[in-house]
Amino acid sequence: MVLVVKVDLSNIVLYIVAGCVVVSMLYSPFFSNDVKASSYAGAVFKGSGCIMDRNSFAQFGSCDIPKHVAESITKVATKEHDADIMVKRGEVTVRVVTLTETLFIILSRLFGLAVFLFMICLMSIVWFWCHR
């Protein structure tokens, strides 16, 4: 018994493009759920590995901050969101992300979305080319 497998070049290209779409979706900053201290629009607690969202008080990393402390830090941080602020609350130092960092975050997310949409378009073109 002989097993014959027909491999078409168009199918290989289609699978490669589909793989690129999946990889770009998983590792794109637009779809990533990773919280990075250097590119997160929230409060970064230096030396503790803790990151706190300004709006929801959600804490990521090794955080154990009481809610009233988080609220007081957030109120100070949101007043002057366009500059670096160093606030002392006990031993906690807060750094608010600057405007240039925020623009960089937006641009990197838009770039990730553009790459994702380009891969979708490329996969559609290859699919229509293969099935014409």
UniProtKB/Swiss-Prot annotation:
Transmembrane intervals: 12-32, 110-130
Side Cytoplasmic, residues: 1-11, 131-132
Primary location class: host cell
Lumenal compartment residues: 33-109
Cleavable signal peptide: none
Gene Ontology biological process terms in this record: transport of virus in host, cell to cell
Any one Pfam family match given in the protein's UniProt record, by short name: BNYVV_TGB3
GO cellular component terms, semicolon-separated: host cell endoplasmic reticulum membrane; host cell plasmodesma; membrane
InterPro entries for the chain: BNYVV_TGB3
Its membrane topology: Multi-pass membrane protein
Record keywords, A-Z: Host cell junction, Host endoplasmic reticulum, Host membrane, Membrane, Transmembrane, Transmembrane helix, Transport, Viral movement protein
Localization, UniProt: Host cell junction, Host plasmodesma; Host endoplasmic reticulum membrane
Record text on subunit structure and interactions: Interacts with movement proteins TGB1 and TGB2.
Annotated family: Belongs to the benyvirus TGB3 movement protein family.
Record's function text: Participates in the transport of viral RNA to the plasmodesmata. TGBp3 most probably contains signals of plasmodesmata targeting is therefore involved in the targeting of TGBp2, and viral RNAs-TGBp1 (RNP complex), to plasmodesmata. Can gate plasmodesmata and increase their size exclusion limit.
Protein name, as recorded: Movement protein TGB3
Organism: Beet necrotic yellow vein virus (isolate Japan/S)
